[in-house]
Amino acid sequence: MDLFNNLALGFATATSLENLFFCLIGVLLGTLIGVLPGIGATATIAMLLPITFQLEPVSSLIMLAGIYYGAQYGGSTTAILINMPGESSSAVTAIDGYQMARKGRAGAALAIAAIGSFFAGTVSTFLVAIFAPPLTQIALQFGAAEYFSLMVVGLVSSIALAHGSIVKALAMVALGLLLGLVGTDIYTGTPRFTLGIREYADGLNFVAVAVGVFGIAEILRNLENEKTRSVLMAKVSELMPSREDFKAMVGPVLRGTAIGSILGILPGGGAILAAFASYTVEKKVSKHPEEFGHGAVAGVAGPESANNAGAQTSFIPLLTLGIPANPVMALMIGAMIIQGIVPGPNVATEQPALFWGIIASMWIGNLMLVILNLPLIGLWVKLLTIPYYVLFPIIMAFCSIGVYSVNSNVYDLYAVAFFGLIGYALLKLRCEPAPLLLGFVLGPLLEENLRRAMILSRGDPMTFVQRPISAALLFLAALVLVVVFLPSVKKKREQVFVEED
């Protein structure tokens, strides 16, 4: 009964005119970002963080959430029409979606992707509503030692699921943790790593770091290597899939939804891995595996359902534990902190309208996407003709104005420029910046809970292994590190990310 009352509160919050407007803005902007290859939801949300400072907390988080799952929808459009995924999670969709388009079935492929995405998004949103409250109650029982261990698990999982070298991912997490130390020590009041600059006494501005590492770095990378884009079909027709298509997509959509719902919770690239896992499963269970790569319906329906389900369930650890499952969720935590909200299990009890409003808005956003996306395909295709050299200077100007408006601090602009160059250098060195951001976000929380646990135990480090939940979480973190270095697992992991590239 409580679930229905809470959902009623959520829908009452999400259906206000203001929140419906920002939900619509979010999903449309997300679709646009998904359609334009090279920008991405992470960079977009990072660049929009300054704007959220001026909005109501519920409205801003609803808009950012809409951008995230809207980008999953939009990414499939370019994957199918021009064989260039707008989002990395749509890379698998391009394999069979583009082949369907070449056979004159672009409309059916887009409709299959949209229907699968809507079903998966709807189901996974209800899973969030069902599982978030009990997990929140469990999290309320956690002490400092348990939170420290939980964050260690989150960081280790992000390393295991990061692209490329595990050693590089470890280095990125370490760098993020170090950046999180900049500022004033919360217990002694001693400045740390501020280089004598008073403006950094409160630490590095999260918005400046995120905009630099993700936004500016991505812009520099795309300007250096602009891809040629030629749309395959000027006119997309026959959007309604045939009866055979519907029969062929039922199983893949159900399996993809299940796979994505589970993998989306894991820290790291849950939606991306879910798409690849779904494609692998569909190929193995298919009676005609030879059709994959040549326009198989299951090759579009399964991965699209999986990546959208993964995008939705990644909100579970964010809303219940305050732990980001991916870089976008880390940015969402940043948006909550900007609004004065402490991420974690207390959000559900202290601000139920915010908690349930976000969940309800996800269902509304999915409905908006499936209604709006197919009629607007012509517009999205035309937007693909905008050159990067026109688009990106405008974006950079808005970023600079937005970052400065948060604190009116010119040093934040220096930080954006510096971290933009750092982020670009990391991309050139094939170091994924996502673990860095997770380390930067979790670093202060990790330190605070570590020191609090040590104070409560009077300096006894055994407190972390004497408390059952904390010990189990630390054992899990150690197990993940050991498993990921096993030769067979390491080889399979490298194979997945090579296929994605």
Regions found by a protein language model. Name each.
Residues 41-50, 64, 79-99, 130, ...:
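Re-entrant/interfacial helical elements at transmembrane boundaries that shape
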Residues 58-62, 99-116, 287-299, 328-330, ...:
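Membrane-interface alpha-helices at helix entry/exit sites of multi-pass transporters
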Residues 27-41, 71-83, 158-163, 258-267, ...:
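Transmembrane alpha-helix interface/packing and boundary motifs in multi-pass membrane proteins
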Residues 69-74, 115-127, 179, 301-315, ...:
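Membrane-embedded alpha-helical segments of transport systems
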Residues 68-80, 86, 296-321, 325, ...:
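A structural-propensity feature for long, helix-poor, extended segments
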Residues 1-60, 137, 191-296, 381, ...:
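Helix-loop-helix hairpins and the membrane-proximal interhelical loops
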Residues 33-42, 80-91, 123-127, 263-272, ...:
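Short helix-coil transition sites and intra-membrane helix breaks within transmembrane domains
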Residues 111-227, 338-492:
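Membrane-embedded alpha-helical modules
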